Amino acid sequence: MQKISNAEIAAIGTEILLGDLVDTNSAWLSQRLAALGVNVYRHTAVGDNRERIVAALGEAAARSDLVVTTGGLGPTSDDLTHECLSLLTGRPLAEYPEARRHVDEMFRRFGRKPTPSNYKQALFPQGSRLIPNPLGTAMGALLEHEGTLFATFPGVPGEMRTMFEETLAPAIRERTEGTIVSRTLWFAGIGESALAERVQDLLDARDPTVAPLAGEGKVRLRITTRAATPEEARKKIEPVEREILSRLGRYYFGRDDETLESAVGRLLRERGETLAVAESCTGGLLAKRLTDIPGSSEYFREGIVAYSNEAKERLLMVPREVLAEHGAVSEPVARGMAEGVRKLSGADYGLSVTGIAGPGGGTEEKPVGLVWVGVADGRGSEAVRLDLSAWARSRAAIRERSANMALDLLRRTLKKAKEA
């Protein structure tokens, strides 16, 4: 049995090339293959064309131990994956009775009758091992050919993921040497370049590898290594993690699946404290993210979206004269919003965001991307000015970064209170 150390992924479908469909499957597959110890070297997207699909699969097979395809397993004339795999390998298509029965059974569940074209999904290159699909009509295939294992999956993400975990993942485990383990550390309040400067020697190391990735006001460092067992891999990762945190601990908010909102929720829950938020330019995004966390009712009191000056005055008790003198996007108003929502809700903390998300509405004095975030507690309030003008063309990016930086301001406030 040939070992699998590397792979390529081919997403098949003209709709991907046209931009009508975003290929999330390849990203998910890359993460899962890496976790199983397989290096993914290339992603390919190819339209519904026989010659191009055959060429893409042939090129991938020449380079890789494993070629994974998604899409092209339907019953229509432009679903060509198994036909092209047959052409590439020289193995004729054959109808598999098991697959035909599966099509019949799935249609029976749907309360419908299959048409002759539906039985195209029972055709596979001879020698294929079928991949069961408990969620749809399209079964996949595992096929060995000249040192390469092909694995075909439907393009529907839920079906593909279930089939991968139940069939391909166990097959890969039998064919890999050792295991790859990764740990992700999350940071906020520091830029990618500043963070990289502090750990450059670790970024230059080969085992474990440390790789940064920034996005929307957060930076992550992924530590990755290969070892014979997961336990041995973790022992190699832990000293590197400790060294990173000794240098960057003040910016660290969690590992792996932790988010800023879950980190804030954990700190509030530990202290038995509560939070309310007042939002303007983020339009409820803060409240939405905070309440996405299961159990957030333990600490989240309420959220107010006060978009207009009149609403800020009426709902949050921001004085009219403060709004008139400083404008809605200002330090006094951000502090007033945080103080107001805290007082009105009876929460321990108030958190606020006010800014200009664009793409219009900016001035020379207050350009698009100017944002103030504020926090208030029993000791007083503070506000921080954010310059997000680099993202002036993306309203969504400004809102997302504003929410992240507001959450990080609250996180740092909670940590200070905990350490006091």
Curated annotation (Swiss-Prot):
It holds the Pfam family MoCF_biosynth. This is CinA-like protein. InterPro entries: CinA, CinA-like_C, CinA_C, CinA_KH, Competence-induced_CinA, MoaB/Mog-like_dom_sf, MoaB/Mog_dom. It comes from the Bacteria. Signal peptide: none annotated. It comes from Rubrobacter xylanophilus (strain DSM 9941 / JCM 11954 / NBRC 16129 / PRD-1). Belongs to the CinA family.
